[in-house]
C-alpha cells in the first residue's frame, strides 16, 4: 500500500455504513484522517459501529443532521448508492467540499495496475473472466477482482502490491465520485438506459460511465464495444489507445468474431462454440475479457482455458437445476430491460418468464417482440406487474399470472410449464421494491426452486 499524506489530519465525513463505507473509514483512519461516519438508519447496536468507534471514528446514526457540517469537513466519501440529492451530499456540494467514492481512495493507495470494467450490462462476468485469465499460471503476484463485484476496493488496495493487478468493476455510481482513477486498461461493455432515477438524464449517466477514461494517457488502453455506434463516438473522448471488440465484425482491429472464431488483431484464438456459457452477450463478454487479458500480456492458453471451463456468475444467467424436464435459471441481475432481452435471446426452448420489480417509470414496450417470440407464459410480481402484464397482452401471451411475491411466482411458473421448458427469473427491473439487493432476490428464487423440487 502506498502511504499518502492527502488525508493526514483532515476532517472527513463518510456517508453510509455499507461495506465500502466501513472499509473506507478504516483506511482513512490508518491514513491519519479524523473521521465522522453518518448513516440515516439506526445502527447504534451493530458490530460495525462498535468497531469503528473503537478505532477512533465518530459515528452518528438514525438521521442525517446537516448541522454536522459546522465541524468543517475537508472531504465527503459517500456510499455509491446514496444519491446526489441527499441532503448531506447536497450540503457538501453547496460548501464546495469534494464528494468522493471508495474507488478514489483505493486508487490513491494502490500500488497495483488497474484493469477497470464498466457498462450497463456484463460488468461482473467480464471482470470475473479477466481476473481468472490473469491468474492462470501466473508466476508472480495475483489478479484481484474487486469493486462493484462485492469485494470492497479499499480492502484489496491495502494488500495489493506492484506485482499484483486489481481488476475492478466500477458502476456509474462509483465513477461519479472519482477524480484521479487511471486504469491501465479500461473496458466499456455497453451503454443502455439505466439508473435515470439516480443520474437524472441519460447524458449524465453516459458521462458518469466515461469518467473511466478521464485520466488515461496514450500509454493506456480503452477496450470498447464497437458494435454500438454511440460507443464509437464516445471513444473519441479518450487519449488512450482504443481497442475495439466486435461480435458482429464491425472492426477487426482488436477482438472480434470471424468465421466462427474468436480473434485478436489477426490471430485466431478459439471457436466461438467452445465458450462454455450460452448467449450472444457472453460472446461479447468473452471478447472484452480476452482483449484486456491480451493487452496485459496473457497467453492464448489462459484465455482458452478460462472460456472453455467458466460456468458463469451467480445471479447472471445462472443455471440452478433441472427437475422433471424443466431447467431453472436465475438471472436476478437483470435489473433493466436490455439484460432481460439478452436472456430471452439466449434460449431456443420455450420460456416461462418470471419478471417484475421496482417501478422506475419505464415503459416495457421494447420487450413486446421478444416476449412474443420466446415466452409461452409469464408470471409477474412487484410494482411493475401491471405494466408488464399490459406488455405481455400486447405480445399475445395467453398465460399471464399476477402474484404478490416472488415466492408465489416460482410454483406458479412450474404449474404453467411442461417438460422441455426453461423457467427463467429475469425481472427486467431493480429489486428494491421487495428486496435489499438483486443477490437477495436471486437467493429467494433459488430457495423457492429448491422447495418445489425437493
UniProtKB/Swiss-Prot annotation:
Pfam families from the UniProt entry: Mur_ligase_C, Mur_ligase_M, MurD-like_N
Keyword tags: ATP-binding, Cell cycle, Cell division, Cell shape, Cell wall biogenesis/degradation, Cytoplasm, Ligase, Nucleotide-binding, Peptidoglycan synthesis
Catalytic activity: UDP-N-acetyl-alpha-D-muramoyl-L-alanine + D-glutamate + ATP = UDP-N-acetyl-alpha-D-muramoyl-L-alanyl-D-glutamate + ADP + phosphate + H(+)
One of the GO BP terms on file: cell wall organization
Cellular compartments annotated: Cytoplasm
Disulphide connectivity of cysteines: none
GO CC entries: cytoplasm
Key word Electron transport present: no
Main localisation: cytoplasm
Binding sites annotated in the UniProt record for ATP: 119-125
Membrane-traversing stretches: none
Pathway the protein acts in: Cell wall biogenesis; peptidoglycan biosynthesis
EC number(s) recorded for this UniProt protein: 6.3.2.9
Recorded GO MF terms: ATP binding; UDP-N-acetylmuramoylalanine-D-glutamate ligase activity
NCBIfam families in the record: murD
Entry's family note: Belongs to the MurCDEF family.
Role according to the record: Cell wall formation. Catalyzes the addition of glutamate to the nucleotide precursor UDP-N-acetylmuramoyl-L-alanine (UMA).
Protein name: UDP-N-acetylmuramoylalanine--D-glutamate ligase
Organism: Latilactobacillus sakei subsp. sakei (strain 23K) (Lactobacillus sakei subsp. sakei)
